[in-house]
């Protein structure tokens, strides 16, 4: 059953950061995310919604004692956040120019040209473009 509100996908990752405000600035400046929403959530912590492209929604917020970030737990993130983009080569160059920790571009057997990027708190992002 599909019942998201207008403008939302059925699934949207919600990432936790030790410094959510800094993470928003980093994701906007490094990868071109646009902030769609910023509003106070529980206990005064901000809730953010970022878009990449027309429908690439990711939500993020401030970590807390109850909801901890991978960084605060000292673990490698258990998930990768995967986005399809229209020009992966251009995004790769933009991310490198911003000083991001990125892998080299590669083409997968499935036909995705892609790279991985690790953000300032260790979340891992995969940006890809279908090329074949």
Where are these regions (language model features)?
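Vicinal oxygen chelate
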Residues: 1-14, 24-25, 31-86, 90-118, ...
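Short, surface-exposed ligand-recognition loops at beta-strand->loop->(often short) alpha-helix junctions
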Residues: 15-19
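C-terminal catalytic core of tyrosine-transesterase DNA break-rejoin enzymes
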Residues: 121
């Amino acid at each position: 059953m599909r019942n998201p509100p207008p403008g939302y996908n059925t699934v949207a990752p919600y990432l936790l950061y030790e410094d959510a405000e800094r993470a928003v600035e980093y994701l906007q400046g490094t990868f071109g995310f646009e902030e769609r929403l910023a509003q106070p959530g529980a206990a005064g912590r901000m809730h953010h919604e970022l878009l990449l492209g027309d429908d690439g929604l990711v939500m993020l917020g401030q970590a807390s004692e109850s909801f901890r970030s991978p960084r605060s737990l000292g673990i490698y993130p258990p998930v990768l956040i995967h986005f399809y983009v229209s020009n992966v080569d251009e995004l790769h160059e933009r991310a490198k120019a911003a000083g991001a920790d990125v892998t080299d571009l590669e083409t997968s057997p499935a036909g995705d040209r892609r790279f991985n990027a690790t953000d300032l708190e260790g979340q891992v992002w995969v940006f890809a473009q279908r090329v074949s």
